[in-house]
Amino acid sequence: MMDNALEMIKLVPGTLCPVMVTKIPPQILKEIDVWVSESKKFKNSQLAGLKAHENVGYQNTHGSGKKHNSYQCSISPHLVDSSFWLAWVLRLTAKYWGMCKSNRDFKLRKWDGHFDGYDIWTNFAYKGDDNPTHNHAGMLSGVIYYKNHGHPTIFDQYGCAYEGLDGTMVMFPSGTYHHVEPQTANKERITLAFNILDTSL
């Protein structure tokens, strides 16, 4: 089972596109169910703005002030620390991007003493929401597709896209530019994103 859980495939085999795709193991999907449930409680609270994870995908605070996703919030660190997800992602990182390094050489980006905690957050998007072309901080980044309705993530510099099947995850070098077009369906779209650091650098 463990070997299968650590398998990823290239999004576009035989090309320079560095995006890798994997299916999320059922037990880890159950953990993510809990994360999303907590995120919904934050989103629906009168104090939601206090927990908002602000980045280019949420609000352009240095420009127009336009919100792209309707709401974003980080996952509570205690949920991440006790998860199989963290071990799984760090082992995937070492296997596919580690260049003979140990999984101990990688960690989830973290904001000590800040309400964001770890650099993993839930995105809630609805009709008209988008995510502008951007890249991420760190060495490696990923997107978890929780409830996506086939709304693709477009990887700009490689001219390819991933449809975002529910229950899958992509990982790619953090400098990879990507975006999501405005959502046309009148449905809730839920994804999670995260950033990994190489601690040996």
List each model region and its residues:
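Catalytic core of non-heme Fe(II) oxygenases with the double-stranded beta-helix
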Residues: 102-182, 187-201
